[in-house]
């Protein structure tokens, strides 16, 4: 199968925050296997080669020191009915990083302005949406003390078929003389970059 010309850059979550997102998704949208993540670049086609796009990510991220991100509140993108977790601390840095990355070989006219967030659930039947939103808010109160994480590693991903993504390579922030680590066994179905401006790497809002 020929992979699609659709690429995104994400930061996978770890620890209690990732567990909260993954567990909620599995309950609200059974069958969903996408890993919890924060999108830095929503999905886009490439007009240049993959190597050139990766080199651009490397140049930008190696010049950026790791920083803390703190998740905020559970809310809703009304137009797309996507339940998301806002970003409080770190939002300004994420927006600045997005603007630097969205240049050169990765330049793309995105449908929505970039808004840092973590997608919790989407494609929910409208009649179930408010119940799911309440459930997400109730569960988030238990996890909120673990809302801060360090953004230090990003992953460049490609859509291999509709809504199925594979990791291509990773890069550490602040490693000026380092190199991206190719993933020889990229995991498919990793995410659905539909990030309403930022979850599955698709910007639906």
What is the predicted function of each stretch?
Residues 75-82:
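Short, basic/glycine-rich phosphate-binding loops at helix/coil junctions
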Residues 145-151:
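Polymerase palm active-site segment centered on the conserved acidic dipeptide of motif C
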Residues 35, 82, 148:
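Beta-strand-rich binding-surface signature
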Residues 1-68, 76, 88-145, 162-205:
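Basic, often amphipathic N-terminal segments
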Residues 8, 82, 151:
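Short hydrophobic/aromatic beta-strand or adjacent loop that forms the aromatic wall/cage
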Residues 71:
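Portal/gating segments that form or line small-molecule/metal binding sites
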Residues 152-161:
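Short beta-strand segments and strand-loop junctions that repeat across beta-rich extracellular domains
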């Amino acid at each position: 199968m020929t992979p699609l010309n659709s690429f995104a850059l994400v930061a996978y979550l770890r620890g209690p925050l990732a567990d909260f997102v993954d567990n909620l998704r599995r309950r609200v949208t059974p069958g969903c296997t996408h890993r919890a993540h924060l999108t830095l670049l929503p999905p886009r086609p490439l007009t240049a080669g993959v190597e050139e796009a990766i080199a651009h990510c490397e140049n930008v991220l190696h010049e950026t020191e790791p920083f803390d991100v703190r998740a905020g509140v559970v809310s809703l993108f009304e137009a797309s009915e996507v339940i998301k977790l806002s970003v409080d601390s770190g939002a300004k840095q994420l927006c600045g990083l997005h603007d630097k990355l969205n240049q050169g070989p990765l330049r793309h006219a995105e449908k929505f302005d970039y808004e840092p967030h973590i997608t919790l659930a989407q494609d929910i039947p409208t009649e179930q949406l408010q119940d799911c939103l309440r459930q997400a808010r109730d569960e988030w109160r238990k996890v909120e003390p673990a809302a801060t994480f360090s953004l230090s590693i990003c992953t460049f991903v490609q859509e291999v078929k509709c809504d199925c993504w594979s990791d291509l390579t990773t890069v550490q922030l602040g490693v000026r003389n380092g190199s991206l680590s190719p993933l020889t066994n990229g995991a498919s179905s990793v995410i659905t970059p539909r990030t309403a401006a930022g979850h599955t790497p698709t910007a639906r809002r």
